[in-house]
Amino acid sequence: MKKRAALLVALSLAVVTVLAGCGGKDSSKSADSKDSVATFEEKKEGDTFTVGFDQDFPPMGFVGDDGEYTGFDLELAKEVCDRNGWEFNPEPIAWDSKDALLKSGEIDCIWNGFTMNGREDEYTWSEPYLDNQQVFVVRADSGINSEKDLAGKTVDVQTDSSAEAALKDNTELSSTFSTEIIPDYNTGFMNLESGAVDAVAMDIVVAKYQIESRSAEFKILDYEIASEQYGVGFAKGNDAVKDQVQKTLEEMAADGTLAKISTKWFGEDITTIGK
């Protein structure tokens, strides 16, 4: 019995030792993973440059009539790739998943009417290349002529958008109406056109394009919810690729390419680099 008891004790101690050893390895691996820091390197000729964008955000990025991705921002990004010898890869994303995709490295940047203001410390940014305002769009025959007329009305706003953030910051105004969160602004304009909502809060650059491309009559209220700037957003710390893109954008501004692309999409040069 004593021998049997001694054997059982020895076996128990061995099991505890093994388990403790396993636990130590798992803890170390978790700590290493938690403390690991992503490293960033410059892109080389032949590398792929993946741009994350919302495919329902014309004229910045969307699906053209030919089924191909197109838009002002995508055209800028492609020109940057062509000049650096990179393979351009436009990657449509769900806007509320952009941060996870950027941090995981599945996309190199967010380039899609991406507002810098209020996000300065969350990403590594290019210099601003476009000014923008958040505004309200209503039906021309709605009888809504100012932001005060929105009291008691319903306003569409895209999820995780700058317009949503601006309205949250302006509770004195936003508390006077109801907001409805939508996945994209194409949905917002369909709701507005059908009368399901009374207004859409959105980027003025996108609003003007949407209004021109639709048969229904809309108007932009003479009220600025917020003023902001667009930039190219990279993962925090990715100065290497950001600097490459910034340098190329400055070259495009100097030789007139930025102005040419802007005029194609907006009828005039509204870019801000080098000005």
What are these regions (language model features)?
Residues 23-25, 74-83, 141, 154, ...:
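Extended ligand-binding regions for polar small-molecule ligands
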Residues 55, 131-138, 204, 208, ...:
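Periplasmic-binding protein-like
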Residues 55-58, 69-82, 114, 135-189, ...:
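Bilobed "Venus flytrap"/periplasmic-binding protein-like clamshell domains
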Residues 74, 78, 87-149:
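Acidic, polar ligand-binding/catalytic clefts
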Residues 97, 113-122, 168-169, 193-227:
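A ligand-binding cleft/hinge motif common to bilobed small-molecule-binding domains
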Residues 17-21:
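C-terminal motif of bacterial Sec signal peptides marking the signal peptidase cleavage site
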Residues 74, 89-101, 179-194, 228:
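Short helix-initiation/N-cap motifs at beta->coil->alpha
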